[in-house]
């Protein structure tokens, strides 16, 4: 399955996400700050990132912007996970390049389904590129 980063400062939310993802067969690495996330990204680029918008040391939307501006990471799927529920917040995240935007509280089964759908599309795109080349 996939190698995922869960970037979430709320330990309870992080544990729920990680538990559900691990039970679905994914490998999960958790971190609680932008600083930790950037360190992880230097070590390994994941298959997908679940990213909280409101982190203690850095805005998740700014992290998303950096991910999309970096050639090595611009195609990594990112799901924003946040308590911000206004349409404007969702539109901003999606406009910056988020692949999905999930609001808290969330249903873990729905999150897993969204992740699997995005990973299927990502894998299909990768297979298509291999065939074309």
Please name every model-derived segment.
Residues 2-3, 117-133:
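Short, Lys/Arg-enriched segments at the junction into DNA-binding effector domains
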Residues 8:
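Conserved acidic carboxylate
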Residues 14, 56, 74, 86, ...:
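The feature encodes the CheY-like receiver
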Residues 30-48:
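Acidic, metal-coordinating helix/loop segments flanking the phosphotransfer/catalytic sites
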Residues 106-119:
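C-terminal output helix
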């Amino acid at each position: 399955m996939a190698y995922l980063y869960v970037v979430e400062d709320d330990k309870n939310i992080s544990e729920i996400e990680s538990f559900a993802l691990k039970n679905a067969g994914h490998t999960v690495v958790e971190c609680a700050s932008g600083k930790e996330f950037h360190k992880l990204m230097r070590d390994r680029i994941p298959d997908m990132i679940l990213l909280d918008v409101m982190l203690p040391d850095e805005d998740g939307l700014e992290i998303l912007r950096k991910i999309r501006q970096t050639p090595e990471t611009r195609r990594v799927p990112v799901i924003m996970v946040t308590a911000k529920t206004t349409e404007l917040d969702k539109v901003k995240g999606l406009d910056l390049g988020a692949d999905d935007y999930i609001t808290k509280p969330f249903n873990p089964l729905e999150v897993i389904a969204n992740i699997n759908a995005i990973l299927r599309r990502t894998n299909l795109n990768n297979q298509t590129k291999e065939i074309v080349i």
